[in-house]
Regions:
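Alpha-helical scaffold/interaction cores of sigma-54-like transcription cofactors
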Residues: 1-304
């Protein structure tokens, strides 16, 4: 990460991050043992990986973008430190989101920063970041959906550049989601194949729940699957409890942004954990492809 946050402090990065966390805790309710243990775990990983400056940078960026209503998306919702800093409204302890999904000692790259701004505020956000951090280039991500990134090194960026740490931050503009459905249509699947093949993402076989999926789809004759059947799939394939299904239902109704974001991350993690085969997860492509070819365009597809 090459952005230089304008922070007024003399202590080292990790000490300053600890101080900011303690400051956020003052005046609040006493921490539970579970909360203390989670903070200790996250700070231990942050210290071992020497990434405190990244979290300070995220905090600094958000302080500048609050005026345009920006929020952070992505795996940041798995971090209790980010929650304490006010960077996300999602309490990962409430939703059972593991920090290891956001960052761990085995990761070779830094977590990517997804900044989402309300419709019509993208240019304001780009201007603020350009002026604040003296960035000279704003690059569209090749094959991206209205995504922009900052780089003083490259004239254009690819997805691969993100994983080479040439990417500073995504800036995305909120898109209106008009359609909620689960599709099993072959035509939709072919479109998904084309979509991912353009990004060199393989849809090869790497799942462990084929028989369960096939049984569910044979019972529905391969027709569209609606919400109640989706919860049944979650319970049967992923072992999701009734309580968790209720959280899914609330989140998918778009009643709360933080619920929706947290459930996405839980779902994403659970699939990885169970080996059910999450192939890709793209916020503004509105596409999930999970398990077998049968479950397609899961959760968000804008059909306009």
């Amino acid at each position: 990460m090459c952005l230089k946050p304008k922070l007024d402090y003399e202590s080292d990065d990790f000490q300053w991050l600890e101080e900011k966390i303690k400051e956020k805790q003052r005046g609040g309710n006493p921490l539970t043992d579970k909360e203390k243990e989670r903070i200790r775990l996250e700070l231990d990983i942050i210290k071992k990986t020497n990434t405190a400056k990244v979290f300070l940078l995220y905090d600094d960026i958000m302080s500048h973008l609050k005026e345009v209503g920006a929020v952070f998306h992505g795996m940041m919702h798995c971090s209790y430190v980010c929650y304490l800093l006010g960077l996300t409204k999602v309490n990962p302890l409430h939703y059972g989101l593991p920090f290891e999904r956001y960052y761990n000692e085995k990761r070779r790259v830094l977590p990517l920063l997804n900044i989402v701004v309300p419709k019509g505020e993208k240019e304001s956000a780009l201007r603020i970041l350009r002026e604040t951090y003296a960035l000279t280039k704003i690059c569209p991500i090749i094959d991206g959906e209205n995504r922009y990134a900052f780089s003083n090194e490259l004239d254009e960026l690819t997805e691969e550049d993100c994983y080479r740490q040439k990417l500073y931050a995504f800036v995305l503009e909120e898109a209106e989601i008009k359609v909620y459905r689960l599709f099993t249509d072959e035509e939709i699947y072919q479109k998904a194949l084309e979509y991912f093949s353009r990004r060199n993402i393989s849809l090869g076989r790497r799942y462990q729940s084929d028989k369960q999926v096939e049984k569910i789809f044979s019972e529905t004759d391969g027709r569209y699957i609606y919400q109640e059947q989706f919860f049944e799939i979650c319970e049967r394939i992923l072992g999701v409890s009734n309580k968790r299904a209720d959280e899914f239902r609330r989140a998918l109704a778009f009643r709360k942004r933080e619920d929706r974001d947290a459930i996405k991350q839980f779902f994403c993690w659970k699939l990885d954990e169970e080996g059910a085969g999450l192939f890709d997860y793209i916020y503004f492509g509105h596409i999930y492809v999970v398990s077998k070819a049968y479950i397609l365009g899961l959760l968000f597809l804008d059909l306009e």
